[in-house]
Amino acid sequence: MKINFYNRNFLKLLIILNFIGIVAAFYTYIPDIKKQVAAESYFLIPFFMVSVWLYLLAFFGTFYLHSRREFPIFFGGLIFLFSFVYGLGSLLFYPLFMFFVYGFSLYHFWNIFAHGFVGFQSVLFFRHLKKQKFYSFAPLVFLFLFYDFLGIFYGGFLYFTDFSFPFFLKMFLIYH
């Protein structure tokens, strides 16, 4: 039996699951949003909500696939890269986080599957991207570097601000 991952009903299911992911991820960030508002660090709010962006971009990606539209060049690249890097990166990050820092928790164990689910959707997105010129990757690379810079040096990466990481693990996660 062959499974068609581009079946419109399957894509509708992915759209619904990604929407649930957006709402659930936003709900988990409410205490952190309140902290940033109290500290008057409003500019960091969009940058630390990695999970919300992950599900939101996957939602748009599956919507484009469902509606049989072509991905815009920059937006399609952003959807793919964000889903690939942060989705599949969670398959590495959360086990290391639980092993070296926090210990086992159902919440972080669940995040392996929830974020990894979006990472595997990036494979669906990849097949529908237009080929890009090399120079068109520069804005995407700059955006990711800026996003990670704010995350690491301005407290946007909440795991680094809320937990004490061993030095070698922090360096590995920053430079992987």
Residue spans for each PLM region:
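Aromatic-rich, lipid-facing transmembrane alpha helices and their immediate juxtamembrane interface loops
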Residues: M1-H176
